[in-house]
Amino acid sequence: MKNPNAEKNPAGIVVFLVIFGSLVLFPLVVTVAGSFMTEQAILLNYSSRITTFDLAAGLTEKFIKILLIPDPVSLEQYAEVLINQPSFLVLLFNSLKITLPVTFGALAAGILTAYGFTLWKWKYKERIFLVYIVVMLMPLQAVLVPNYIIAAIFGIEKSYLAIILPGIFSPFGVFLARQSMKAIPDAYFEAAKIDGAGNWYILFYILVPQLKSTIAAICMLTFIEYWNVVEQAVIFLDDYRLEPLSIYLSRLADGKTALIFAASCVYMFLPVWFLLSGQRDLEKGIELSGVK
């Protein structure tokens, strides 16, 4: 006799995924729709169930509908963000000044370090790699104070370098690249060494072409992480002119709602586009690394 509990229920799975996906996408839909609404339309339509208490009237409830289709459509807030507020673009470039060096630096450091862990034979390499894993699993807040102390010793605690250097030498890229390199058969390296190939030739002409998906995964995950940097910027950057865009958005909390929606859409456009355009490489890169 078959166990009915063991049989799969595709309809139930589909319903669950639809509900879960809707809950995940709803804030994004609200943000995008709100970015094309006027401030008056947002104040009129966007709200939640509000319960208030008055001594004379008692409990009162107010319901305001949530409108997800802009009516009328307005681009005024985008013009306000991109044209009338030059500081927004300055802070956007500040985010790029942090994100791009960390992304490319972490990629280069991760590939080179992973090469040494994978192909070279030296004592205690597995123990040292274990230290990498332990550091990778530590929460960011646990290493902020040591990072600040080290940055203060070198006199860079108030500059981008205090954020960029720890990001470049993050163990995550090393871990991901090494796991992918271990999946490549040793026959490739042995044949190359027999033909007289050196380390740089093996790295750039044998390893890198087979690690394209892993390289894309490292770049995407690092870019998104440091595009959304908050804690490091708050601690290290005391000059508002150096702040990234992620800090600017938190200051908009008391501003116009339509302006917040528009700024949020501009802010999330680049990482969302980056992620969607490289989704296949991201999935394949994580699959090759064996990360579950």
Language model features by range: what are they?
Residues 2-9, 13-292:
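A structural signal for multi-pass alpha-helical bundles of membrane permease subunits
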